[in-house]
């Protein structure tokens, strides 16, 4: 059974005025029309759900686990939650990340989420010749990103789009090489309606591709 995991990294989880949320909802409507009844869709809202960060409790728990020591109740609780997040991620084969671009990078809760899924011997392993991703089984990743600026003009902004560079590099590292980003960009300088319409078209095409169906234009 195929499973799609939606990773909502917007601080305002259901903000109807958010461009990234609008584009995501348009994608989801299109996607649901195309997938079979056997497809499962799950969603994690990073700013509503508990997503542990790497802090002294987590570091202490990891050290104790490595030494075979007993965890405190707090350490056990946080590591169990981290394991739940990891297993949910591993159980999917298609991923959709929704985020606003803040100061050229991903939201902080998305970084915390990445720290929950980038676990040695689970999603990658160390070898004598370097690290190897363990998710090389045809998984697919779609990133929906909204931004006030434009990041595809091959200029200074392109160089500092750290969100895209980081996510693409990390998921490639884990073995997920089918990576696509849809940008609803330029909301601060372009006509918002035009930005949305362009992004809607792109996510419709992305939904079709991810559902293994293709839209053919009669005007070709």
Swiss-Prot record:
Enumerate the residues binding FMN: 18-20
Give the reaction(s) catalysed: 2 a quinone + NADH + H(+) = 2 a 1,4-benzosemiquinone + NAD(+); N,N-dimethyl-1,4-phenylenediamine + anthranilate + 2 NAD(+) = 2-(4-dimethylaminophenyl)diazenylbenzoate + 2 NADH + 2 H(+)
Transmembrane segments annotated in the record for this chain = none
Q: What is its EC number?
A: 1.6.5.-, 1.7.1.17
Give a GO molecular function annotation for the protein: electron transfer activity
**Class of the enzyme per the UniProt entry, highest EC level:** oxidoreductase
Q: Recite the UniProt cofactor note for this protein.
A: Binds 1 FMN per subunit.
Output the superkingdom of the source species.
Bacteria
* Cofactor(s) annotated in UniProt: FMN
| Keywords on record | Flavoprotein, FMN, NAD, Oxidoreductase
Concerning InterPro entries, the annotation shows:
Flavodoxin_fold (IPR003680), Flavoprotein-like_sf (IPR029039), FMN-dep_NADH:Q_OxRdtase_AzoR1 (IPR050104), NADH:quinone_OxRdtase_FMN_depd (IPR023048)
Q: Does the keyword Translocase apply?
A: no
UniProt similarity note: Belongs to the azoreductase type 1 family.
Q: Quaternary structure?
A: Homodimer.
Function description: Quinone reductase that provides resistance to thiol-specific stress caused by electrophilic quinones.
Give the protein name, as stated in the record.
FMN-dependent NADH:quinone oxidoreductase 1
Origin organism is Bacillus anthracis
| Gene symbol of the encoding locus | azoR1
């Amino acid at each position: 059974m195929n499973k799609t995991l939606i990773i909502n990294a917007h601080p305002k989880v259901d903000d109807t005025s958010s461009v990234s949320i609008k584009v995501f909802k348009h994608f989801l409507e299109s996607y649901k029309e195309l997938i079979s009844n056997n497809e499962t869709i799950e969603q994690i809202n990073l700013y509503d759900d508990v997503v542990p960060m790497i802090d002294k409790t987590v570091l202490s728990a990891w050290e104790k686990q490595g030494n075979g020591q007993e965890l405190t109740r707090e350490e056990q609780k946080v590591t169990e939650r981290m394991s739940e997040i990891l297993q949910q991620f591993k159980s999917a084969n298609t991923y959709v990340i929704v985020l606003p671009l803040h100061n050229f990078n991903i939201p902080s809760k998305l970084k915390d989420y990445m720290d929950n899924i980038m676990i040695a011997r689970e999603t990658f392993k160390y070898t004598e010749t370097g690290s190897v991703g363990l998710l090389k089984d045809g998984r697919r990743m779609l990133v929906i990103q909204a931004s006030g600026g434009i990041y595809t003009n091959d200029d200074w902004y392109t160089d500092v789009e750290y969100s895209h560079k980081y996510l693409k590099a990390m998921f490639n590292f884990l073995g997920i090489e089918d990576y696509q980003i849809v940008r609803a960009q330029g909301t601060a300088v372009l006509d918002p309606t035009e930005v949305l319409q362009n992004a809607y078209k792109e996510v419709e095409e992305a939904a079709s591709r991810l559902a293994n169906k293709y839209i053919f234009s009669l005007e070709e």
